[in-house]
A protein has these predicted regions:
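Eukaryotic intrinsically disordered, low-complexity regulatory linkers and tails enriched in Ser/Thr/Pro
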Residues: 1-13, 17-62
Length: 62
């Protein structure tokens, strides 16, 4: 799970395994394999870095 910030400043945890795509339009829109979408304050690169960090934690066993 990664934490992101919605446009209303609410923080939410999302399942990074369900992310299908991330695009900037100019807001960052995360699309999920479930068909849902969420608009967040983080940039596309920030989301990428969060997912990479999360995956490293899981696979290293921290």
């Amino acid at each position: 799970m990664i934490e992101v910030t919605k446009l209303n400043d609410k923080k939410v945890l999302i399942n990074s395994d369900l992310i299908e795509s991330v695009e900037e339009t100019p807001d960052t829109v995360i699309s999920f394999t479930t068909g849902k979408k969420i608009i967040v304050k983080e940039s596309r690169q920030d989301i990428k870095n969060l997912v990479i960090s999360y995956k490293k934690e899981i696979f290293v066993g921290i």
